[in-house]
Amino acid sequence: MVAPQFVLRDTEGTVHGPDEWSRAQAIVIFFTTIDCPLSNSYVPEMNRIRQTYSDRGVAFYAVQTDTTIAEAEVRRHARDFAFSFPVLIDPRQSLVQLAGATATPEVAVLSKSGKVLYLGRIDNRIEDFDKRRSVVTESDLRNALDAVLAGRPVPHARTPVVGCGINFLTQEKKP
């Protein structure tokens, strides 16, 4: 299997593609949308996880899943929420399809060849849409990354996600 063969531009205009992805030990995709409060609440934690793992060869990207949101709004959202990693514009939902994501905030860990090694929640903080744990007891994304970087299989390759459903390509893009 080879790295995904498409290129995507981020909100700052930088193009990301196969050459970049093939150099990573693992690729984390954070599926998000600007109007999902659960997804927005996870940006600080995703920034912390990126800070911990990026020096170990893990590449981090967020993907705006709602293709009807204007790019200027996505750019504003990325800046307002202080993402510390690129927010990709994916007009064909290529990464959503590759990973099989269905909700935000959902994360995928991909191998450098594009194989989905983990798909699911970041941790177990969110029990239900309006119910959160005061203490996280399962750090699923961190556990998956630790396993991948150690060359071990991910113990729980799929975990359930509580979040906002992804709107799949059926609507016209807003100006």
Language model regions located:
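N-terminal "domain-start" segment that seeds a small globular fold
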Residues: 1-19
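Short, thiol/selenol-centered motifs that function as redox-active sites or metal-ligating centers
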Residues: 33-44, 67-68, 107, 164-167
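Loop/turn elements at helix/coil->beta-strand transitions in domains of secreted/extracellular proteins
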Residues: 24-27, 56-59, 83-85, 104, ...
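Structural microenvironment flanking redox-active thiols in thiol-disulfide oxidoreductases
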Residues: 40-81, 88-98
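Short active-site neighborhood of thiol/selenol oxidoreductases, capturing the structured segment around
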Residues: 17-41, 60, 145
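Thiol/selenol-based redox catalytic cores and closely related redox-interacting motifs
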Residues: 91-171
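Structural recognition of the beta-strand scaffold that forms the well-ordered cores
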Residues: 29-30, 59-64, 86-89, 109, ...
